[in-house]
Amino acid sequence: MSSGGLLLLLGLLTLWEVLTPVSSTDRPEFCELPEDSGPCKGLFHVFYYNSDQNQCLEFIYGGCYGNANNFKAIEECKRTCAA
């Protein structure tokens, strides 16, 4: 296969990966955790996955501790947790 064909195949596989939603069986367990602002007093606008509403929602993160269900960008939250 030519290098152009391999590049096209790689591009198509990457596109498929980005566009394929996460199924609930593939979703990481931390996506089920509740939002957790943590004890610090920062005001960081971040996102968490709300498993009851099946969507990523914004919340204010204090900047320390909290849990893994915490994303800087909604796209990252959707890619990781949303089905």
Swiss-Prot record:
InterPro entries hit by this protein: Kunitz_BPTI, Kunitz_BPTI_sf, Prtase_inh_Kunz-CS, TFPI/VKTCI-like
Signal peptide: 1-24
Chief location category: secreted
One Pfam match: Kunitz_BPTI
Location in or out of the cell: Secreted
Site (Reactive bond for trypsin) location in chain: 41-42
Family: Belongs to the venom Kunitz-type family.
Stated role: Serine protease inhibitor.
Protein name, per record: Kunitz-type serine protease inhibitor vestiginin-4
Native organism: Demansia vestigiata (Lesser black whip snake)
